[in-house]
Amino acid sequence: MKKTMLAFLVLLNTIGFAQKIKPVLPVPTKEHLAWHEKEFYLFIHFGPNTFTDKEWGDGKEDPTTFAPTQLDCNQWVRVAKLAGAKGIILTAKHHDGFSLWPSKYSAHTVRESKWLEGKGDVVRMLSDACKKGGLEMGVYISPWDRNHPDYGTPKYNDIYIATMKELLTGYGKFFELWWDGANGEGPNGKKQEYTFRRFEDSAFAYQPHLMIFSDIGPSIRWCGNERGIIGNTNWNLLDTAGFYRGHGGPPEDTLNQGNVNGKLWIPAEADVSIRPGWFYHAKEDNKVKSPNTLFNLFLKSVGNGGNLLLNVPPDRRGLFHETDSASLVGFAALREKAFKTNLFTGLKPLVKTTAGLPTLTYTFKKATKLNAVVLQELIEHGQRVKTFTIEAKESTTGNFVKIFDGTTIGRKKIATFDPITTSSIKITITDAKAEVLLKPSAAHDFGFEVKN
């Protein structure tokens, strides 16, 4: 009984006793907690592929191919802020090996282009724009390099670490370092044996609070697909023993759902592009995802407890295309409309327990229309909830009928259902690892159709 009461004291925002709560391991670090709060940020794929109309360059492209005419990182930041994104991750070096900064460890960089007479630095420009605009920045640095002559030799691992050091010590604080799982051949036909443990140790030495993304972390995991969808069941926990990055990584369903008893806190990030491709292609100008499609992806990623990394590739001018920008602004407007009003505001739930599991009943002052309930755990003490249900009271019979069957909650669960009008909502936790610690719940009427 004491544990149950403690749980509900936390639920009702009286958190003075939280330090006495026994955690359910593993628990997130403070860096994880800050990352979880970001929810949504942009990915930017930009480089020679933008101008060659390719997705994967071969490293043989002439550096002068990179020739943006109006590059404006401040425009990227302005649009990102209008979209409600909390940061931007830039492909500083993709698989072609072309560096968007004048790296001294490569001869395939913006320095060798004619853009700004070889004196340009996209990473610097974006870093400055993000600082000015109040956004955080991250970098994608591809380990695979199809241009570097030392790729496929032990020396290349040292070069890669030196390359990371250039970026991680020369451009300010980054919130995330992104590692792609691709590992193909270099210009000499050789594949590289990456020393990822050294890479990790070096990156953390340069920026101790950095979050590192890859198939298996160490900080953040891939969600197992590039469709922007995280599993309805989503544990922030993962077992990585016996798995590798790229080929040899965990199966898709494991990446998508995590491990219920995983030993490490490695939450899922959903990456998806606003267009069919990752780089800009003019032929895709009429295939940009609509605001409604983006909103549904938000529900399937952030709404399942992960983060959404949405790719928006600049065009050959070096600007976000007008169609992409309009869709992003429309996406933000839908989120604002959907979550603006919390229908539970001012209501105190009636709390009952059965076998230590809570039921929360919210009673409205009058019949109320809604189509979503938002639940959140206090994940700093571990992820606990395994299953839950949501019921609504019928006006004719007075009985409660089930409107949602859920599994995990984690950092956030946005449970959506067909619009209903009811006088009362009942939330029941039906299974959990330990005492349930929830933040105050929310209910919403989006005011538009949601496709589940």
Question: Each predicted region: which residue ranges?
Answer:
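Bacterial Sec-dependent N-terminal signal peptides
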Residues: 1-20
